[in-house]
């Protein structure tokens, strides 16, 4: 099995996979439910690369990041990881799927991720080819599109899309 399958695949022998519940519970908690998940995808004209750990050496080349809020928070708060914050500060599209499920978890983690994504790159090691001028001027959140998918409307989700964030025009 590939490293991607080993890290993110479903282990049928896992006791967590043997649990059963009502249909709505099964719909949310099927497959690999690890809440610290991160994938970096690099898209090039000639090839596509997938990295299980986008914070590793290839992170500066990841065009698409798929990660749980907890994975982003842990990476952003780890000491000596300013490069992670610099990388997250130039996110142009933020897609939050099953946001209603995230509301029932630790919503503060989601808010911290949004603040990390709204930050200004501060490191001289930031990839200047990827950082656009509005992001350097603390107006990156005005250039970012938020897509929030939820099964119901909630004030916290509306605030995520409607309210001005730090540095927003």
Listing of model-derived features with the role each one plays in the protein:
Residues 139-145, 154-169:
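Interdomain hinge/linker at the junction between the two RecA-like core domains of SF2 helicases
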Residues 28-34, 45-65:
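Conserved motor-coupling elements within RecA-like helicase/translocase cores
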Residues 36-38, 61-65, 90-93, 142-147:
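Loop/turn-to-beta-strand initiation segments
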Residues 31-33, 56-60, 84-88, 137-141:
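Conserved catalytic network of the ASCE P-loop NTPase/AAA+ motor domain
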């Amino acid at each position: 099995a590939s490293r991607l399958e080993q890290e993110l695949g479903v282990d049928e022998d896992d006791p967590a996979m043997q649990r059963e519940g009502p249909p709505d519970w099964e719909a949310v908690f099927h497959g690999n439910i690890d809440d610290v998940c991160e994938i970096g995808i690099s898209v090039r004209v000639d090839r596509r690369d997938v990295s299980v750990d986008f914070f590793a050496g290839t992170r500066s080349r990841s065009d698409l990041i798929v990660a749980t809020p907890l994975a982003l928070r842990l990476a952003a708060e780890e000491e000596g990881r300013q490069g992670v914050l610099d990388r997250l500060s130039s996110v142009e599209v933020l897609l939050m799927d099953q946001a209603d499920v995230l509301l029932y978890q630790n919503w503060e983690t989601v808010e911290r991720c949004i603040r990390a994504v709204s930050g200004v790159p501060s490191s001289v090691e930031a990839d200047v080819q990827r950082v656009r001028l509005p992001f350097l001027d603390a107006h990156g959140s005005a250039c970012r599109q938020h897509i929030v998918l939820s099964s119901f409307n909630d004030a916290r989700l509306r605030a995520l899309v409607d309210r001005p964030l730090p540095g927003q025009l």
